[in-house]
From Swiss-Prot:
Interacts with protein G7; the interaction stabilizes both proteins. Keywords: Phosphoprotein. It comes from the Viruses. Belongs to the chordopoxvirinae A30 family. It comes from Fowlpox virus (strain NVSL). Phosphorylated by viral F10 kinase. Required for the association between the dense viroplasm and the viral membranes to form the mature virion (MV). InterPro entries: Chordopox_A30L. This is Protein A30 homolog.
Length: 74
């Protein structure tokens, strides 16, 4: 795991913890807003993961095609 990934994970965990704490505030409107923010962040995060998986899959396919073409002898 890269240091950068580790830092991103810590920041994501910190933000999630902060939002969870703020969602327990007694003001129902504020709490609802924070809960909505949490859901939006979950959707964004899942979309980023989906895009990252597609990128890695496409990258592997391109690399395997490049490797196959380099093995062709004339």
């Amino acid at each position: 795991m890269d240091d950068i990934d580790y830092i991103d994970d810590i920041n994501e965990d910190s933000i999630n913890h902060m939002l969870s704490t703020l969602a327990n505030v007694r003001d129902p409107e504020f709490s609802a807003t924070i809960s909505l923010m949490q859901e939006v962040l979950k959707i964004i995060n899942s979309r980023i993961i989906e895009i990252d998986k597609k990128y890695k899959k496409n990258n592997r396919n391109i690399n395997s095609m490049n490797n196959a073409s380099s093995r062709v002898s004339y």
